Amino acid sequence: MTAIRLAGSPEEVAAAYAVRADVFVTEQGVPPELELDELDSTADHFVAYDGELPVGAGRLVVEDPGFEGADPALGEVGHLGRLAVRPQVRGTGLGVALVQAIEARAAERGLRVVALSAQTQALGFYQRLGYTAYGPEFDDAGLPHRWMTRVLG
């Protein structure tokens, strides 16, 4: 059974980092020095466990109004990022559950809009969850991305 938790200890944050390293660095070839960034220190980190094994991760960072083109009238923006699911649990709904947990946390924090930069191969996944792509394609760590946003509620 899979459980998603808001990381509440350094060990759980390290578990999130380990999942991200497996997916982004090992599998996708993102340089390790680009995978961890300055946003990690202020983020809410989420970890999905299959028993005791960490199998998914994601984070939420609160950004200023108007972040990456979001409507400034909606206030601060929840920046969903570093969503990663290990290969053995892909296709099980875990990615959807992680996004929903992060969105719920954003709503708890009083945020009305969530933005993310999606790898272009994942655009359909986020569109099915109500996100809308905008702006041109751009490179992030050697992978094509587009910005997406969703108003909560």
Model-based region annotation:
Residues 47, 53-70, 77-84:
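Conserved beta-strand in the GNAT
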Residues 36-40:
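Short loop/turn motifs at secondary-structure junctions and domain boundaries
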Residues 85, 91-104:
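Conserved acetyl-CoA-binding loop-helix of GNAT-fold acetyltransferases
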Residues 20, 126, 131:
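Conserved active-site tyrosine of GNAT-family acetyltransferases
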Residues 119-120, 139-153:
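C-terminal "cap" of GNAT-fold acetyltransferases
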Residues 99, 106-119:
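Conserved GNAT acetyl-CoA-binding A-motif
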Residues 18-32:
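Helix-loop element at the rim of GNAT/NAT acetyltransferase active sites that forms part
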Residues 1-16:
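A short beta-loop-alpha structural element at the N-terminal edge
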